[in-house]
Swiss-Prot record:
Role according to the record: Activates KDO (a required 8-carbon sugar) for incorporation into bacterial lipopolysaccharide in Gram-negative bacteria.
Compartment list: Cytoplasm
Organism: Rickettsia felis (strain ATCC VR-1525 / URRWXCal2) (Rickettsia azadi)
Protein name, UniProt field: 3-deoxy-manno-octulosonate cytidylyltransferase
InterPro entries: Cytidylyl_trans, KdsB, Nucleotide-diphossugar_trans
Keyword Ribosomal protein: no
GO biological process terms held by the UniProt record: CMP-keto-3-deoxy-D-manno-octulosonic acid biosynthetic process; lipopolysaccharide biosynthetic process
GO molecular function, one term: 3-deoxy-manno-octulosonate cytidylyltransferase activity
């Protein structure tokens, strides 16, 4: 298998404020978390784990051959859960990069995961995250996050508002992060910052503390399931691709 020095961790917590028991919601006959895991597993990396506080989620993943790490339900964020899971990986001293894939993207493309790994390894950024070029209509449709970057693709700011103001094209931020090990360790040691709390975006903690985030372009915006409406969109998308035999 490729990238033996990389761990992919999918944090998945049973409790959810906007969509009850979100990881267990069905898309077709398959739970959300199983779909996410199967997509991620196509990247074919040995160190792929689901980090959870739930026996039910763990059993689902184990039945399809996945590896599970149990983490405390009191852990506040997905990034903290990712770090706690990383510390519990056997022989983790050989892992230098950690990819945090959110457990709510049932159609995430494995190629996007591999792209951020390659980009991270061939750059000097602390963290790398994918972005998609979109028009105004695409990002106005829901509470998406956009990012402003410099000429080299280094992130300058992330916002739930459309940035840069007045533009017609935007960079949609895909909620997936590739960390250098020392960057993840530093991130979880830092206290939440003013901008992070104002925008409700963890990644601003990174920028406010002088760390760097590189962006890499990917082709498609993955569906994220946070609400009942999102779930309906995911089910409809699944039904459409099923009709096409994809």
């Amino acid at each position: 298998m490729q990238h033996q020095d990389v761990a992919i961790i999918i944090p998945s917590r049973l409790s959810s404020t906007r969509l009850k028991q979100k990881p267990l919601q069905l898309i077709g006959s398959t739970t959300l978390i199983e779909r996410v895991f199967k997509q991620v597993n196509q990247a074919n990396l040995e160190h792929t784990y689901v980090a959870t506080d739930s026996e039910e989620i763990a059993n689902i993943i184990k039945k399809v051959g996945g590896k599970v790490i149990f983490t405390d339900s009191a852990i506040p964020t997905g990034t903290d859960r990712t770090y706690e899971a990383f510390k519990l990986i056997p022989n983790n001293q050989n892992i230098n990069y950690i990819v945090n894939v959110q457990g709510d993207m049932p159609f995430i493309e494995p190629s996007s995961i591999l792209k951020i790994i390659e980009y991270l390894k061939n750059s000097e950024y602390d963290i790398v995250t994918p972005v998609v070029k979109v028009d105004r209509e695409s990002v106005e449709a829901s509470s998406n996050v956009t990012v402003a970057v410099d000429s080299a693709g280094k992130a300058l700011y992330f916002s739930r508002s459309l940035i840069p103001n007045g533009a017609e094209k935007f960079l949609y931020h895909v909620g997936m992060y590739g960390f250098r090990k020392n960057a993840l360790e530093k991130f979880v040691s830092l206290k939440p910052t003013f901008l992070e709390k104002t925008e409700r975006l963890e990644q601003l903690r990174v920028l406010e503390n002088g760390m760097t985030i590189g962006t890499c372009l990917v082709e498609n915006v993955p569906i994220s399931v946070d609400t009942e409406d999102d779930l309906k969109k995911a089910v409809k998308f699944y039904e459409n691709i099923s009709k096409l035999g994809l």
